[in-house]
Amino acid sequence: MDQDAFILKEDSEVEREAPGGRESLSDVIGFLDAVLSSEPTDIGGDRSWLHNTINTPQGPGSAHRAKSEGEGEVSTPSTQDNRSGEESRVSGRTSKPEAEAHAGNLDKQNIHRAFGGRTGTNSVSQDLGDGGDSGILENPPNERGYPRSGIEDENREMAAHPDKRGEDQAEGLPEEVRGGTSLPDEGEGGASNNGRSMEPGSSHSARVTGVLVIPSPELEEAVLRRNKRRPTNSGSKPLTPATVPGTRSPPLNRYNSTGSPPGKPPSTQDEHINSGDTPAVRVKDRKPPIGTRSVSDCPANGRPIHPGLESDSTKKGHRREHIIYERDGYIVDESWCNPVCSRIRIIPRRELCVCKTCPKVCKLCRDDIQCMRPDPFCREIFRS
């Protein structure tokens, strides 16, 4: 009997709570429809209605329960507790849209602060428009009730009055970087401010533009004198006759040995050697190529002496030429005399005198018994 009574009481309690649950569900659905139908771009609008509590009628809050053991226990939850629970659920559902709206307001405020602190009057007028509706209200409400900072108010004032910055510059007042600390004095270096260098945030600063001045002609001349290039050494200096050891430079009032005064024909080598007016100039020897030797006129001990390449070839006479080759397993050395004035060829052969002053036969030619390569020149020498 007690169990049947308990079941009947529970059914009646469920029937009482069901209408209240349906009413709260319909209120939540209506609230969601209102949120979804609102304009998403209306960020700065009045949303004070979001903080209003939703009052829903509730049924009788007292319920009596009985246990099978016979002990009765009365539970009387108040209507205020039910309302607080429903308000917490509703606030939990609405916290996400409210947080998104507040984050959007903060982003707009940060953008407005950045435009007011880092751009000049021209960029502010372009970004905020010509005083029309740019999407940001002049004084958007603060949902959380936090006090606004002085920097934000100052930025709003500068955005509303863009001509104030130009007046400050015309009066020569020091300009501060919006949203940051003031610029250091001129005496301080860029390494101050606790190791952080401060750059000017505005391109219209009078302190920055005061550095870019037109230089005076005196400054330009000083810079040109300082930056004038020094004469660079293109290389080692050429050796002059005065610096060459063992030589003597001619006096300035004399003519060189190779030149001749005007009005005179060019002199020959013999005149230079015999003349006493010109300085003594050593004539470089003409060196024959390797493989040939010059011959002196004075043999020693009855044998011909073949001097080296340093012999003087200007003396008239003969030179001894040799050719060495192999024949039938033997090394053959052929030698003959040629006039000094004749050409020296790669393939040695007998040459005729060109200057017509060289002797036909010298002492070395007389010692030749036979001519290994007879030719008309050899026959003429031996006939004579």
Curated annotation (Swiss-Prot):
Belongs to the paramyxoviruses V protein family. The C-terminal zinc-binding domain is involved in binding to IFIH1/MDA5. This domain is also involved in viral pathogenesis. One of its GO terms (molecular function) is metal ion binding. Keywords: Host cytoplasm, Host-virus interaction, Inhibition of host innate immune response by virus, Inhibition of host IRF3 by virus, Inhibition of host MDA5 by virus, Inhibition of host RLR pathway by virus, Interferon antiviral system evasion, Metal-binding, Phosphoprotein, Viral immunoevasion, Zinc. This is Protein V. Residues 1-23, 38-318 are annotated as: Disordered. The keyword Zinc applies. The keyword Ion transport does not apply. Residues 7-20, 83-101, 150-168 have a biased composition (Basic and acidic residues). InterPro entries: Paramyx_V_Zn-bd. It comes from the Viruses. Zn(2+) 1 binds at residues 318, 337, 362, 365. Residues 50-59, 191-206 have a biased composition (Polar residues). The modification Phosphoserine is found at residues 68, 125, 192, 249, 257, 260. The lineage of its organism: Viruses, Riboviria, Orthornavirae, Negarnaviricota, Haploviricotina. GO terms for biological process: symbiont-mediated suppression of host cytoplasmic pattern recognition receptor signaling pathway via inhibition of IRF3 activity; symbiont-mediated suppression of host cytoplasmic pattern recognition receptor signaling pathway via inhibition of MDA-5 activity. One of its GO terms (cellular component) is host cell cytoplasm.
